[in-house]
């Protein structure tokens, strides 16, 4: 089976490092991708926002040492996951996110490629 998402876009906010209740660190990014069409001779832009969670330890460590600032151009490769939560009013909300967590998943800065993290070792051996 294959579940793979690839994005090239721009960060909508500075990267953020968080820690779970059990002490595991992960990073969050918001990435915008755009597509363009011409309608009646005028260019129209359509932007889609993507929530990205990074769990790969080497990439999280790399992000701890720097901030991917708002507006940074990035390449993201991960898997699509669908989540849900219930708000204070009991209303269910559904959303999708891109998760960078396993072999073959990666995050790269396209602004400064020389600073990119080393690829994660293949955890499947």
Each model region followed by its residue ranges:
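Single-stranded nucleic acid-binding surfaces, predominantly the OB-fold ssDNA-binding core
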Residues: 1-125
